[in-house]
């Protein structure tokens, strides 16, 4: 099934391209929304990603997962978009106080959607590094290369993202206790 779909897209068959989009569009839109705060920007990144997938599908050699290959294009497109729009923002993330850890039961009571909304509220630099490191498995070295920032800055953004999320979780915890 997947091989036939790939071959159809290589041949620029519109039905195959539509089927590929319908099969993976929602999954990849979730990735785009993790990186972009605005749904319209997320849709733009998704469309640009599929354009790149269709354009470069001939380069897929069948080594590894096809979905993984496409996912990398989606993530890289989102990162490229952030780099273009926010060159200076990636170098700065607001300073916050480090507080005690959040109770594990608070995290367990959160839905995935609620947690992802908290991640989306992070400043762009922190959110981008958090997504790349935690969600997409990049190392700090890879993040620094992709975002063209020092490796230490990547680690700093990750640390600040963790602190900001802890603060959000504490506010959530105090809200549910009231």
Give names to the regions the model predicted.
Residues 1-27, 34, 120, 141-142, ...:
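N-terminal module of bacterial RNA polymerase sigma factors
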Residues 9, 28, 32, 42-53, ...:
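Short, small-hydrophobic-rich alpha-helical interface motif
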Residues 10-11, 37, 47-65, 85:
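Sigma70-family region 2
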Residues 58-62, 72-92, 160:
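Arg/Lys-rich amphipathic alpha helix in sigma70-family domain 2
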Residues 79, 126, 135, 146-172:
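DNA-recognition helix of helix-turn-helix
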Residues 87-112, 139:
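Internal acidic/polar
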Residues 115, 129-130:
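Short alpha-helical "packing" element that flanks the helix-turn-helix/winged-helix DNA-binding module
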Residues 119-127:
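Short helix-coil-helix linker/hinge
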């Amino acid at each position: 099934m997947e091989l036939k779909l790939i071959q159809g897209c290589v041949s620029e068959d519109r039905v195959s391209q539509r089927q590929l989009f319908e099969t993976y569009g929602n999954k990849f839109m979730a990735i785009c929304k993790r990186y972009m705060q605005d749904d319209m920007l997320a849709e733009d990144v998704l469309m640009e990603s599929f354009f790149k997938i269709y354009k470069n599908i001939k380069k897929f050699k069948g080594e590894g997962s096809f979905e993984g290959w496409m996912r990398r294009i989606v993530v890289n497109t989102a990162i490229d978009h952030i780099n273009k729009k926010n060159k200076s923002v990636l170098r700065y993330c607001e300073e916050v106080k480090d507080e005690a850890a959040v109770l594990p039961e608070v995290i367990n009571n959160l839905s995935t959607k609620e947690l992802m909304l908290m991640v989306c509220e992070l400043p762009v630099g922190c959110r981008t590094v958090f997504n790349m490191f935690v969600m997409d498995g990049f190392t700090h070295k890879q993040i620094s290369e992709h975002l063209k920032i020092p490796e230490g800055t990547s680690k700093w953004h990750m640390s600040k993202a963790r602190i900001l999320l802890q603060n959000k979780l504490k506010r959530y915890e105090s809200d549910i206790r009231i």
